[in-house]
């Protein structure tokens, strides 16, 4: 009997542990410091458009750019020439230089109209140097643009689906310069947590030290864990691959409510709880009605004139908001039921959540984005 009770108690404890923590790989919780993408940008011209390019009278930089490009190719445009081009558009080209990118590697580029071009569909991007923040050229972009939108116009009417003023070129740029990296220099590497958490940083450090020896990992702060690595490059890759595949028991995160003030969206995680409180909510509406009355003479021979008068009316309406009790809720489903019982719109719900937080009834961090 005692043995059965002990087994049952052990199963209950294991169930509680699995519900409050989950095993995740270190690679899903962290990133390697210094291993990141770098932004590239360039200015270029798109040609071959079917009459949907820039209006050069309104975008003089397009004509200037074309003249400069032609002069570099040995073609001189007479000064004062008014080039009316409809198949050329000035664009900005952006790309991401991947970590450990090598010369000759292809990367995707995004092409966006800079002027007033109607569409970039069917256009070809001419050779465009892509520079980094240090003003050095790291890649060259060129190729046919793929535009995901579609549109048509006739007789003054037009129809457009999605965006026509931007597109992508898959593998449209070639890396010409490699970015130097400091990966694993001096036998030290830092892992950066995706979210700052002192306990998680300590857990990651303890897990690595248990498998690779004491002193291998050291938590520096709530977001950084420092690793002591081999100095050989091949051994560093093997060591980091091993560390990233280690699993860590991750406790349940902080209770959090995210409110988007622009769209009215409200998102909660499963740890949000409510204390008992009473809520009253009501809307105040101001209605302005402007009625137009036309007065005309009864007979055309009376010599009167038609008079237009306006009768404005202003009314204020306030909806009654009785106090409603919100019961304490210990789970996300109960929180949803309690808030839905108020019958509040998303905009009202944002104000209610703020008031609940101020009153200490919302046991969660409220973030407004």
From Swiss-Prot:
Annotated GO biological process: bacterial-type flagellum-dependent cell motility
Name of this protein: Flagellar P-ring protein
The keyword Hydrolase is assigned to this record: no
The entry's keywords: Bacterial flagellum, Periplasm, Signal
Function: Assembles around the rod to form the L-ring and probably protects the motor/basal body from shearing forces during rotation.
Family: Belongs to the FlgI family.
Domain of life: Bacteria
Protein's organism: Photorhabdus laumondii subsp. laumondii (strain DSM 15139 / CIP 105565 / TT01)
A single GO molecular function term of this UniProt record: structural molecule activity
Signal peptide extent: 1-23
The keyword Signal appears for this protein: yes
Coiled coil regions in record: none
GO cellular component, one term: outer membrane-bounded periplasmic space
Quaternary structure (record): The basal body constitutes a major portion of the flagellar organelle and consists of four rings (L,P,S, and M) mounted on a central rod.
Subcellular compartments: Periplasm; Bacterial flagellum basal body
């Amino acid at each position: 009997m005692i043995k059965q009770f002990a087994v049952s108690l052990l199963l209950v404890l294991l169930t509680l542990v699995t519900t409050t923590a989950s095993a995740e790989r270190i690679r899903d919780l962290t990133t390697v410091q210094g291993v990141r993408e770098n932004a590239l940008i360039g200015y270029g011209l798109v040609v071959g458009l079917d009459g949907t390019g820039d209006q050069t009278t309104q975008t003089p930089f397009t004509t200037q750019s074309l003249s400069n490009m032609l002069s570099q190719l040995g073609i001189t445009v007479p000064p004062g020439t008014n080039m009316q081009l409809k198949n050329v558009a000035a664009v900005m080209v952006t790309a991401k230089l991947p970590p450990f990118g090598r010369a000759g590697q292809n990367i995707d580029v995004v092409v966006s109209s800079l002027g007033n071009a109607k569409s970039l569909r069917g256009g070809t991007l001419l050779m465009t140097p892509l520079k980094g923040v240090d003003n050095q050229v790291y890649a060259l972009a060129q190729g046919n643009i793929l535009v995901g939108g579609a549109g048509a116009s006739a007789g003054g009417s037009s129809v457009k689906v999605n965006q026509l003023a931007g597109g992508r070129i898959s593998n449209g740029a070639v890396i010409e310069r490699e970015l130097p990296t400091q990966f694993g220099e001096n036998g030290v590497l830092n892992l950066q947590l995706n979210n700052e958490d002192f306990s998680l940083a300590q857990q990651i450090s303890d897990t690595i030290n248990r498998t690779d020896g004491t002193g291998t990992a050291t938590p520096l702060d709530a977001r950084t864990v420092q690793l002591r690595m081999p100095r050989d490059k091949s051994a560093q890759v093997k060591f980091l691959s091993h560390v990233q595949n280690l699993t860590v028991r991750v406790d349940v995160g902080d209770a959090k409510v995210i409110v988007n003030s622009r769209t009215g969206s409200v998102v909660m995680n499963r740890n949000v709880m409510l204390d008992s409180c009473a809520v009253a909510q009501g809307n105040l509406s101001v209605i302005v009605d402007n009625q137009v009355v036309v007065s005309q003479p009864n007979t055309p021979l009376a010599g009167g004139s038609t008079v237009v008068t306006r009768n404005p009316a202003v009314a204020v309406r306030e909806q009654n908001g009785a106090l409603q009790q919100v019961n304490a809720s210990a789970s996300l489903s109960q929180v949803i039921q309690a808030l839905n019982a108020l019958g509040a719109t998303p905009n009202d719900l944002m104000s209610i959540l703020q008031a609940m937080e101020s009153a200490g009834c919302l046991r969660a961090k409220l973030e407004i984005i």
